[in-house]
């Protein structure tokens, strides 16, 4: 994580995680992540929120065939995503790579933005990109029916932590006031 001013953190990002979907709903977040990654040279992990399921894990688990889970990395390449049956999402990762970005994917196993924040922190991300209009309880326990923007504003206003970039549906980006 970073302790530089937020504007500098975006320009000098080495790793960013973007909260995206398999369909077109959050393509504006994916596009913004691709652009920031292309400009800064950052590694981009597209975090697929749609893969979370109450009934199954998107990744092989201890009940899978012998060593099946060991064949996949973290994060996942577009080829690994295809092997896991996630072709539409794999195509998004491949498109970002074709645009010159060091792009990877990850399949959410838990619902909500708390899971993507935890993933970003665990992987040492500098930035996290979230849709500005997302209304979902849970973001770091701060969302109670409010928008992501309101939750981030309530986050501790410190100089350290995960820099949050909010992406509007028209693709405009804005740095959130607080860090997570």
Segments from the language model and where they lie:
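Small/aliphatic-rich secondary-structure junction motif
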Residues: 7-73, 165
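Structural beta-alpha unit
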Residues: 1-10, 94-128, 171-174, 180
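A short acidic, glycine-rich active-site loop
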Residues: 68-87
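Glycine-rich, Arg-bearing micro-motifs that act as flexible, cationic patches
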Residues: 127-157, 173-176
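Short, hinge-like loop/turn segments at secondary-structure boundaries
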Residues: 61-65, 122-124, 146-147
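Well-ordered alpha-helical segments embedded in enzymatic catalytic cores
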Residues: 29-32, 88, 115
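Short beta->alpha connector loops
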Residues: 22-25, 109-113, 134-135
């Amino acid at each position: 994580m970073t302790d530089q001013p937020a504007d500098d953190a975006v320009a000098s990002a080495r790793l960013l995680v973007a909260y995206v979907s398999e369909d077109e709903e959050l393509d504006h977040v994916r596009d913004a992540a691709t652009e920031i990654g292309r400009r800064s040279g950052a590694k981009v992990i597209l975090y697929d929120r749609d893969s979370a399921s109450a009934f199954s894990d998107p990744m092989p688990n201890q009940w899978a065939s012998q060593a099946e889970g060991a064949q996949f990395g973290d994060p996942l390449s577009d080829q690994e995503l295809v092997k896991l049956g996630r072709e539409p999402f794999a195509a998004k990762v491949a498109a970002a790579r074709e645009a010159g970005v060091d792009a990877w994917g990850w399949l959410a196993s838990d619902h909500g933005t708390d899971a993507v924040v935890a993933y970003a922190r665990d992987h040492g991300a500098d930035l996290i990109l979230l849709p500005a209009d997302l209304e979902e309880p849970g973001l770091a326990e701060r969302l109670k029916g409010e928008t992501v923007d309101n939750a981030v504003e309530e986050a501790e206003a410190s100089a350290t932590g995960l820099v949050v970039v909010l992406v509007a549906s028209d693709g405009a980006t804005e740095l959130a006031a607080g860090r997570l």
